[in-house]
A protein has these predicted regions:
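A ligand-binding cleft/hinge motif common to bilobed small-molecule-binding domains
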Residues: 100-119
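Short amphipathic alpha-helical coupling segments at ligand-binding clamshell hinges
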Residues: 68, 72, 134, 143-155, ...
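Extracytoplasmic ligand-binding site segments that recognize negatively charged/polar headgroups
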Residues: 1-95
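A bilobed periplasmic-binding-protein/Venus flytrap-type ligand-binding module shared by bacterial periplasmic
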Residues: 9-16, 58-60, 133-144, 163
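Periplasmic-binding protein-like
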Residues: 6, 36-40, 72-77, 83, 88, 154-178, ...
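Hydrophobic residues within well-ordered alpha-helices
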Residues: 94-97, 138
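An extracytoplasmic/periplasmic, membrane-proximal ligand-sensing/linker region
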Residues: 172-215
Length: 215
């Protein structure tokens, strides 16, 4: 089951953007890096796709959605991009100004960090926004499959999804749940801009080692 609805976002250091808006598309992201050159060298962060599963997933979806994604990668490389395996490592550096931008950061972590660190801003890319879902399943060999089934049923219920959205600050996927931190609201705001990763056996493609090596 898909339990959440979490976008990949740009994050930025608000005090670094008092004279211009932060980039809101990948083309604007590339343009910003080229225009600012040495001023932002070493101040861009994203996931290390060799060590971060979510980073690899987001980059693989970028390759499918955006024909010119390698221009983004080249621009970040020229800007001395720093690579990390965790969201918190990037967000910490954006919040204190060591980084001006973070690319493809998991939105739920970014939102939690921004709520506690007012200098962190978030942009849902206007060209397209990749969305991933956390998956829940009960293994065939589970010792207590009924308990696992009840656990998933609760988190898929209106009550469970509401707790997830309001208390855990993780966007709820259920259409029965309303509010700011839900798939319903994101779809109303962004419509076709959202590009969810389909929850299907096709997800196994992203575990294929040949595909990972090619990317």
């Amino acid at each position: 089951y898909a339990l959440t609805f979490e976008p990949a976002v740009f994050v930025y250091h608000k005090p670094s953007f008092t004279k211009e808006k932060p980039p809101s598309t990948r083309a604007e992201f590339v343009d910003y890096l080229k225009r600012h050159g040495s001023a932002v060298f070493g101040k861009i962060g994203t996931y290390d796709i060799e060590r971060s599963g979510v980073g690899f997933l987001f980059m693989a979806r970028d390759q499918e959605q955006f024909g010119d994604i390698w221009s983004v990668i080249q621009a970040m490389g020229a800007a001395g991009v720093k690579l990390y395996s965790t969201s918190s490592a990037i967000l910490e550096r954006v919040s204190d100004g060591r980084f001006v931008l973070g690319y493809n950061i998991l939105g739920s972590y970014a939102a939690d960090w921004a709520a506690r660190h007012p200098d962190v801003g978030i942009v849902l890319p206007r060209d397209y926004t990749v969305v991933m879902s956390r998956i829940g399943l009960v293994p065939q060999a589970a010792a207590t499959p009924d308990l696992g089934r009840r656990y998933l049923e609760f988190f898929m219920s209106k009550e469970g999804q509401t707790i997830m959205a309001r208390e855990l600050q993780i966007p709820a996927v259920s259409p029965d749940v309303a509010g700011a931190n839900t798939a319903n609201t994101m779809r109303e705001m962004l419509g076709g801009q959202l590009k969810p990763v389909p929850v299907s056996p096709g997800l196994m493609v992203y575990l294929d080692q040949v595909k990972r090596a090619r990317l």
